Structure formats: C-alpha cells, structure tokens
Amino acid sequence: MITRWILALAAALVVPEAATAQHGSGPGGLTTVAPREASQFDFLVGQWELTVRVPSPGGLAARIHGTPRLAGTWKAWRGLDGWGVEDELRIVDGSGNPLSLTHALRVFDATARGWTSTTLDIYRARVTQGTGAWRDGQMLVTAQGTDAEGHAYVSRGRYYDITPDGFKFQQDRSLDGGRTWTEGAVRIEAKRVAAVAPR
C-alpha cells in the first residue's frame, strides 16, 4: 500500500512538469522552444572552403612574399535543441600544415536577445567567451581571449556579404582593452562546399 502511495505521489509531481515541457515552458517560465532568432547563425551551417588572410609580420620577407595566404575549412551543424550552432574551424598554411583548430558552441540567449559563444582553441587549450548580435544583415561578435603569444586581447568581428553560397568574416583585435585596434587581423572568405557537413 505504501509503495502504491509513493508511486502516485511521484506521478503527481512529475506529470505536470512533463506536460508543461511539451507546451514550450516549464517551471518558473522556462522556455524550451527556441525562438525565431535562434536561426540567425543558420547561414554558417554546412561545410565551407576558406581563403584566410592575416597581416604579414613585416620585414624583408613580407615585402618579398606579401601577405600570407592561408586556407581552411569551416563546418557547422544546427544543434542544442534548435537554440544554436556547433562549429569547427581549421586553418592551415600554404603547405597544409595545421595552424589553428577551434570548436565553438553558439547559443541564442532569449533573455538577452543575443548570442553567447564559447570557443575552444584546441591546440593551445584556451577558451574564449563571446557575445553576438544580428544587425542589418550582418552578425556582429565580440570576445575576449588570449593569442598564440599569450597576450590578452579583445576582438570584434563581423560576418557579412552573406549568401547561400558564401560569406566573409573580418576580425579586428585590440591588445589595449579596445583603445586601439588592428583592423583585419583575420579576414576569411568562405565558399560553400556542402549544405550538410560530415562529423
């Protein structure tokens, strides 16, 4: 008899919570259905071939060879129950040697009406936190992190010229908390290879 009573009590406590989850909100107004804005990063979904440009370090080699031209791939998948995108960015030098591998989770924050991202620099074991917002057909992102030499930086980036077959990305960096900026610290031109990226 006591077992039956415990089961009935457990069912009474669990069923209302499960029922509200099916209708998009749960206890305390928790929203479980992603809003329309959670699709703003959908342009990134798929597989991309990249042309990457970074400023040359200067000196004689830079005058002779010019700005280094790098290549890469960017793969992205919808995820997080419709709330965001998971992506992987790989950059290699002209000989195919790996230079950078990052893995990012981008989730729409319905309360802040913007994006929150966490990016892991795999080779350097560094994590960068950022935010983003969709404005005038561009995705604008800001972040704080540590560069390959261990210097703290602030970055501002934008995804622009977004079409079904391509997009461009530019990241500017500041090493002094945003007082001065190196514009175009990274420039990427992406061309779609596939609508769905393999894992």
Residue ranges of each PLM-predicted region?
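Hydrophobic small-molecule pocket/channel-lining residues, especially in calycin-type beta-barrels
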Residues: Q22-R199
